[in-house]
């Protein structure tokens, strides 16, 4: 592959099957990781188009005799069965958000104008992988695939989860479907989600809910406005309540979570000369993990409003939007950081030693919440900057993941580099 050239064949259908994934462990770890990243970056896997990549990941994992592999839809789960006293789950999603002129991917040589200034300053003289999914989260997926291939005798049993539909509505999420159909596949004592965190720990996550706040009026011709009631004008009170909301920062298990309540969409009206009889303000509430989902809903609409996903509009009986109609659109629980779990404490110590970084709160929602519901402590830890996720110039420097996989292997440096059969393990949870 030539630097600064695209990796996919010109004119090829990006949704077609990809070549088998391989991992050459005869060279350095860095070379193997770069090769794995190239291979999975070259697969177009926007949500709903993950199947070719899932097929290739499944075939790769089934070629490893130390792993037992299961598949549910386009989610692939591989695990060791060594009878170790504890099990760690490593999970990463295969899908990406839609491309924005950033596929096929490419390696950028030092000095290429497509390299961001902040990336060039942090990683001078390095190649940079540019393209959709580089940080969110194929760099972490590449690390997981490398570990799956090389950790043949880990200190603890391991489960690798590569799942689909993380970037879309919760009901399509592959991890959610596995948790419902095969929760035993996800059993463990600790879980790690490879969301981009610049190789630092981000604990837990804020919960999120989306709902329409609905105002009603009476339609009339705008020439005779007094014959109607303007629903859009009534929405002014909704906006006033949003403007008066003061975001709180809440400390949970030593980490600071900032909440937010914002209008993200507004719609109303059926014609330019018609007084609107309905207006909808779409609201997103991000709440700290000191609250359950029902408690968060109570703060927004009261304890007995009755608004649930799919059951239409209900009147808020209390909370911020008391008196207005509420129609739920999406909801996901928060997750406590779990930083008091023994494995989390050990991992935090290791990350601190290698990077100097202390754990932070995860302000966005991630699938750590699904593991929390299963009773499995989980944290976010992955390669790449979260600030570049979903951006048109998404990219990661070649050394952007090095602090991370190096943290997960033990044994002599020579054994680590050649990927030998020397006893290896997850040092962070010994």
State the predicted function of each range.
Residues 113-127, 147-161, 184-187, 242-252, ...:
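Phosphate-handling active-site elements
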Residues 72-74, 92-94, 164-165, 194-197, ...:
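Fold-independent oxyanion-binding glycine-rich loops
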Residues 6, 11-134, 152-155, 349:
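Acidic/His- and Gly-rich active-site-bordering loop/insert found
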Residues 88-90, 161, 192, 377-379:
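Hydrophobic/aromatic beta-strand patches that form the interior of the parallel beta-sheet core
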């Amino acid at each position: 592959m030539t630097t600064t050239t695209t990796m996919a064949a010109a004119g090829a259908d990006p949704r077609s099957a990809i070549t088998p994934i391989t991992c050459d462990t005869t060279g350095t770890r860095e070379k193997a990781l770069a090769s794995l990243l190239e291979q999975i970056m070259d697969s177009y896997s926007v949500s709903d188009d993950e199947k070719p990549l899932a097929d290739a990941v499944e075939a790769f994992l089934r070629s490893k005799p130390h792993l037992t592999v299961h598949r549910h839809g386009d989610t692939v789960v591989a695990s060791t069965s060594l009878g170790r006293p504890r099990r760690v789950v490593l999970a990463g999603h295969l899908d990406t958000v839609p491309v924005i002129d950033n596929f096929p991917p490419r390696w950028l040589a030092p000095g290429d104008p497509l390299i961001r200034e902040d990336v060039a300053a942090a990683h001078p003289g390095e190649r940079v992988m540019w393209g959709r999914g580089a940080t969110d989260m194929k760099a972490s997926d590449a690390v997981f695939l490398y570990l799956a291939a090389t950790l043949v005798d880990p200190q603890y049993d391991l489960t690798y989860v590569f799942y689909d539909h993380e970037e879309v509505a919760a009901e399509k999420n592959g991890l959610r479907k596995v948790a419902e159909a095969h929760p035993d596949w996800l059993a463990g004592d600790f879980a790690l989600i490879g969301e981009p965190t610049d190789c630092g720990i981000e604990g837990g996550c804020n919960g999120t809910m989306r709902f329409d706040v609905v105002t009603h009026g009476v339609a009339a011709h705008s020439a005779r406005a007094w014959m109607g009631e303007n629903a859009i004008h009534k929405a002014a009170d909704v906006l006033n309540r949003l403007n008066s909301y003061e975001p709180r920062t809440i400390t949970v298990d030593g980490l600071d979570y900032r909440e937010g309540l914002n209008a993200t969409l507004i719609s109303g009206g059926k014609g330019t000369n018609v007084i609107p009889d309905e207006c909808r303000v779409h609201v997103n509430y991000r709440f700290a993990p000191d609250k359950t989902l029902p408690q968060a809903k109570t703060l927004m609409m009261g304890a007995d409003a009755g608004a649930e996903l799919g059951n239409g509009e209900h009147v808020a009986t209390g909370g911020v939007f008391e008196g207005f109609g509420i129609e739920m659109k999406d909801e996901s629980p928060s997750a406590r950081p779990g930083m008091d779990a023994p494995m989390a404490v050990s991992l935090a110590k290791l990350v601190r030693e290698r990077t100097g970084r202390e754990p932070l709160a995860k302000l966005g929602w991630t699938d750590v919440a699904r593991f929390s519901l299963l009773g499995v402590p989980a944290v976010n830890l992955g390669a790449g900057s979260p600030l570049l996720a979903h951006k048109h110039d998404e990219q990661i420097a070649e050394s952007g993941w090095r602090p991370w996989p190096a943290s997960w292997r033990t044994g002599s440096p020579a054994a680590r580099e050649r990927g030998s059969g020397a006893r290896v393990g997850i040092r962070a949870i010994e």
